[in-house]
Amino acid sequence: MSPPAAVSPPARSAELASAPAVKLPVGLSKNSAAATTVEEMEGKWDDFKFAPIRESQVSRAMTRRYFQDLDNYAESDIVIVGAGSCGLSTRYILGKKRPDLKIAIIEASVSPGGGAWLGGQLFSAMVMRKPADAFLREVGVPYEDEGNYVVVKHAALFTSTIMSKVLQLPNCKLFNATCVEDLITRPSKEGVRISGVVTNWTLVSMHHDDQSCMDPNTINAPLVISTTGHDAPMGAFCVKRLVSMGRIEKLGGMRGLDMNVAEDAIVKGTREIVPGLIVGGMELSEVDGANRMGPTFGAMVLSGLKAAEEALKVIDIRQKQNSF
């Protein structure tokens, strides 16, 4: 392979220049008590000591904030189901365009990111076809330019970057290790309107067959964006639920791998499937019978952008409908 034709800017220089110094917990010894930077702690480890804490303080610090989030996001403006590359890209754009919207992200896995921590066959590099490189520049991920496509040296670099930006957004909460077990519905002239999600701990959901009395929780939202990936134990969940509800006759069935056909189809097809439910990413392939694209990630990112665009078109209407 020829060397890369060009290399993108690794990050916006202004962002790097303005990054604040990292602050660590201050110790209590005479050498570490006044330390406010890493450099001030170096070489003084013999007398180092952390600030004291009681175990209940740790418990309350976690519990108080989590239950405040549960209370706050019980009524959300948008719920994104799935925190893979499509879902995270959707959240990033929504945060940029409408920072006022309160958005919960529900991720079944302990670790967000979906399949975007590695490239194909557990390899490191991530390939994106142009013009998805525009989003990499937007979030500050460096890449090698190979002409019609670009290569990020490790997929985890993209995923960790977009995740860090999303989690710093206002009005954003990620509930990981949490899965969507069902959809909240309301009657409408179209048959049904989606108005929220039914949630549970993922570990609880995995044991419904051998345990009982494990009812779920709920989040009301006028708009749900589902990006759970192709058919799998937790994948394509929302569209599979639409089939069992009778809102979709059957799944289209994902077709064989064709990168050129698949990526265009996924981005163009990202839309509101039924009122209140937008579907993007590989979950859409199960609705439309689209081809799979394999280890190229541009469609996931740009489907996220289009999902955000579709959401902004209908959110005001769906909010007015969501009064009960």
Curated annotation (Swiss-Prot):
Substrate binds at C86, E107, A108, G115, V180, D215, H230, M282, R292, M293, G294. Its cofactor is Fe cation. GO terms for cellular component: cytosol; nucleus. One of its GO terms (biological process) is thiazole biosynthetic process. During the catalytic reaction, a sulfide is transferred from Cys-213 to a reaction intermediate, generating a dehydroalanine residue. InterPro entries: FAD/NAD-bd_sf (IPR036188), Sti35 (IPR027495), Thi4_fam (IPR002922). Keywords: Cytoplasm, Iron, Metal-binding, NAD, Nucleus, Stress response, Thiamine biosynthesis, Transferase. SUPFAM superfamilies: FAD/NAD(P)-binding domain (SSF51905). It comes from the Eukaryota. Binds 1 Fe cation per subunit. Induction: By ethanol, Cu(2+) chloride, and by phaseollinisoflavan (an antifungal isoflavonoid). GO terms for molecular function: cysteine-dependent adenosine diphosphate thiazole synthase activity; iron ion binding. The modification 2,3-didehydroalanine (Cys) is found at C213. Its main location: cytoplasm. Its EC number is 2.4.2.60. It is found in: Cytoplasm; Nucleus. It catalyses: [ADP-thiazole synthase]-L-cysteine + glycine + NAD(+) = [ADP-thiazole synthase]-dehydroalanine + ADP-5-ethyl-4-methylthiazole-2-carboxylate + nicotinamide + 3 H2O + 2 H(+). It is an enzyme of class 2 (transferase). NCBIfam families: sulfide-dependent adenosine diphosphate thiazole synthase (TIGR00292). Involved in biosynthesis of the thiamine precursor thiazole. Catalyzes the conversion of NAD and glycine to adenosine diphosphate 5-(2-hydroxyethyl)-4-methylthiazole-2-carboxylic acid (ADT), an adenylated thiazole intermediate. The reaction includes an iron-dependent sulfide transfer from a conserved cysteine residue of the protein to a thiazole intermediate. The enzyme can only undergo a single turnover, which suggests it is a suicide enzyme. May have additional roles in adaptation to various stress conditions and in DNA damage tolerance. PANTHER family: THIAMINE THIAZOLE SYNTHASE (PTHR43422:SF3). Homooctamer. Belongs to the THI4 family. HAMAP family: THI4. This is Thiamine thiazole synthase. It comes from Fusarium solani subsp. phaseoli. The lineage of its organism: Eukaryota, Fungi, Dikarya, Ascomycota, Pezizomycotina.
